[in-house]
């Protein structure tokens, strides 16, 4: 496979996106971004109160992330982004930017990241396993009570998206090895 310019490590809260993403970036020598660092203060407060984010809450955040990816890809800097990217439309915004036009995954003419291919790494797992992880996590603004809302809107990647699916039941070395193998 031709090496992508962007690895998008996605999944629900507690799936291991930040841990896996940071490790992959370190192994590859790529830049790492954690999308959680770019949430507005309003979004953080809303989630901390147990209120799920709406599309309107997420779109400006996704557009900011798109701009970061676009900038780095234009500079030839490969990137690993850890981001929930729960819906297909959210992943499309990360690739294409904008929020006011219908998004089509097969419309490569409007794909600003076309010069830097994107590989989606979908970290999947059962509600019970991930909920158990969230109960162990301390100091994060996303409470375990919001996990069901994430599973409710989750649209796992599918063709024609460029993706691999890796189970969170695997160990961290097994997960990173699966991604590294997919990059060969």
UniProtKB/Swiss-Prot annotation:
Entry's Gene Ontology BP terms: carbohydrate metabolic process
Family under the similarity heading: Belongs to the gluconokinase GntK/GntV family.
Substrates-to-products reaction catalysed: D-gluconate + ATP = 6-phospho-D-gluconate + ADP + H(+)
Pathway(s) where this gene product acts: Carbohydrate acid metabolism; D-gluconate degradation
Species: Mus musculus
GO MF term set: ATP binding; gluconokinase activity
Domain of life: Eukaryota
Positions that bind ATP: 11-18
Keywords attached to this entry: ATP-binding, Kinase, Nucleotide-binding, Transferase
EC number assigned by the record: 2.7.1.12
Region forming the signal peptide: none
Gene3D superfamilies reported for this sequence: P-loop containing nucleotide triphosphate hydrolases
Name of the featured protein: Probable gluconokinase
Keyword Phosphoprotein: no
Keyword hit for Transport: no
């Amino acid at each position: 496979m031709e090496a992508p310019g962007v690895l998008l490590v996605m999944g629900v809260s507690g799936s291991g996106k930040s841990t896996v993403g940071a490790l992959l970036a370190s192994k590859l020598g790529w830049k790492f971004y954690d999308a959680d660092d770019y949430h507005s203060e309003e979004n953080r407060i809303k989630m901390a109160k147990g209120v799920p984010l709406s599309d309107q809450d997420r779109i400006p955040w996704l557009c900011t992330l798109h701009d970061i990816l676009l900038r780095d890809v234009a500079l030839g800097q490969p990137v690993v982004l850890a981001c929930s990217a729960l819906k297909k439309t959210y992943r499309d915004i990360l690739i294409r930017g904008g929020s006011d036009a219908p998004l089509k995954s097969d419309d490569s003419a409007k794909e600003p990241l076309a010069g830097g291919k994107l590989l989606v790494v979908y970290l999947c797992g059962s509600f019970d396993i991930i909920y158990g992880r969230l109960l162990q996590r301390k100091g994060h603004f996303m409470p375990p009570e919001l996990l069901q809302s994430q599973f409710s809107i989750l649209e796992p990647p599918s063709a024609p998206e460029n993706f691999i699916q890796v189970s969170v039941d695997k160990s961290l070395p097994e997960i990173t090895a699966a991604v590294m193998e997919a990059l060969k």
